[in-house]
């Protein structure tokens, strides 16, 4: 493997491992500081909004100033963010930490993505980006597991460790990464109005709404899961890490071994509808359950459902896009980011009203998603009849 690509993969792995490390300890951290579910929602939303705003500028700056420089700046910001969270004793410091963390993600991701494109031979780009996606998922899966066991020592230790990982990634990047003489450009391109008029916007309206609704519901549940289980069955950070890591592993296995097989027998819309119905049933069981192992097993099942929905939506967007793959990908990303921003805000406020309220909201949103899928299926059927 190319040395630079290995370092880029390692950087991405460390970043997402660092993000995952802190998830199991948040309930203990919030209780320690006397913060609420609404506060957690604001912290998560601040990260998402900051990343959403900075990402396009990060891509443009990477093209103008060099991707290595932007990656290194992003890694330093990541470490600063984690260390601030580790020493923070009031909400304003934690909020500033999350904003800086979002900025770091908005710089590292475009820089790494662009540099992988630069140093990859054309016939290996798809494979290398596939590896990047797998490495991101690995960081998310392993992070909570490691963080939960670190929290047995101190609930602030995962944040210090994540900050140290950022410094390690920064040093490796300075020493081992080099900007290529010829590079791709992934920043803003000149907007040509005539291109927008050629796009059949009606094709994308319902899928975009579906993406927003599902991102809203999924992010709402995932943001409050650790706090929810901590309050309901007194899960410790180690328990939360087992649930999230176990669910992530099972979800990844289902994606690898079963997703392609399902796609041979179901259309994306049909598969999404059944996955949503499955998720509703499992979420209802989560509300009813009150035992340690019952909730642990149900948690595994919940994350499997969510991990199957996401690639199906991405696949559907790609299939309807035709020669507008870039536009469809951007639309998918934009509406996903909007859902990831709005969902935690509302879920956090609802949690303070009743701990089950975010689960009820996720159930309602999933049912709304089923209705949207049925509407989209009818629309697609009419379009096919018109083409005949």
From Swiss-Prot:
Belongs to the major facilitator superfamily. TCR/Tet family. It is found in: Cell membrane. One of its GO terms (cellular component) is plasma membrane. Gene3D superfamilies: MFS general substrate transporter like domains (1.20.1250.20). Involved in quinolone resistance. May constitute a membrane-associated active efflux pump of hydrophilic quinolones. The keyword Glycosyltransferase does not apply. GO terms for molecular function: xenobiotic transmembrane transporter activity. SUPFAM superfamilies: MFS general substrate transporter. It comes from Staphylococcus aureus (strain MRSA252). The keyword Transmembrane applies. InterPro entries: MFS, MFS_dom, MFS_Efflux_Transporters, MFS_trans_sf, Multidrug-R, Tet-R_TetA/multi-R_MdtG-like. It is a multi-pass membrane protein. It comes from the Bacteria. This is Quinolone resistance protein NorA. The chain crosses the membrane at residues 5-25, 42-62, 69-89, 99-119, 129-149, 157-177, 201-221, 239-259, 269-289, 293-313, 331-351, 355-375. Keywords: Cell membrane, Membrane, Transmembrane, Transmembrane helix, Transport.
């Amino acid at each position: 493997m190319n040395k630079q690509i290995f370092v880029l993969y390692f950087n991405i792995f460390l970043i997402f491992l660092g993000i995952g490390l802190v998830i199991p300890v948040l309930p203990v951290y919030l209780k320690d500081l006397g913060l609420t579910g609404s506060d957690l929602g604001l912290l998560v939303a601040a990260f998402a909004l900051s990343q959403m705003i900075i990402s396009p500028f990060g891509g443009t700056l990477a093209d103008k100033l060099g991707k290595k420089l932007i990656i290194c700046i992003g890694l330093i910001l990541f470490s600063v963010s984690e260390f601030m969270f580790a020493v923070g004793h009031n909400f304003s410091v934690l909020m500033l930490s999350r904003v800086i963390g979002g900025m770091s993600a908005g710089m590292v991701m475009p820089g790494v993505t662009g540099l992988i494109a630069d140093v990859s031979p054309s016939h290996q780009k798809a494979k290398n980006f596939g590896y990047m996606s797998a490495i991101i998922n690995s960081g998310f899966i392993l992070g909570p597991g490691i963080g939960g066991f670190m929290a047995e020592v101190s609930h602030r230790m995962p944040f210090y460790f994540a900050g140290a990982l950022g410094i390690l990634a920064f040093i490796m990047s300075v020493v081992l990464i080099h900007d290529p003489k010829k590079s791709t450009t992934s920043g803003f391109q000149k907007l040509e109005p005539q291109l927008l008029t050629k796009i059949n916007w009606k094709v994308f309206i319902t899928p975009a709404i579906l993406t927003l609704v599902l991102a809203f519901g999924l992010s709402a549940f995932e943001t409050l899961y650790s706090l929810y289980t901590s309050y309901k069955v007194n899960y410790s950070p180690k328990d939360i890490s087992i649930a999230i890591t176990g669910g992530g592993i099972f979800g990844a296995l289902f994606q690898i071994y079963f997703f392609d097989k399902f796609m041979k027998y179901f259309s994306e819309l049909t598969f999404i509808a059944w996955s949503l119905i499955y998720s509703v049933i499992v979420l209802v069981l989560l509300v009813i359950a009150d035992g340690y192992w019952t909730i642990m097993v149900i948690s595994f099942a919940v994350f499997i459902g969510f991990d199957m929905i996401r690639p199906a939506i991405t696949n559907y967007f790609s299939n309807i896009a035709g020669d507008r793959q870039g536009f469809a990908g951007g639309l998918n990303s934009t509406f996903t980011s909007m859902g990831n921003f709005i969902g935690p805000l509302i879920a956090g406020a609802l949690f303070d009203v009743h701990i089950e309220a975010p689960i009820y909201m996720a159930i309602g949103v999933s049912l709304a998603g089923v209705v949207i899928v049925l509407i989209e299926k009818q629309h697609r059927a009419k379009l096919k009849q018109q083409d005949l």
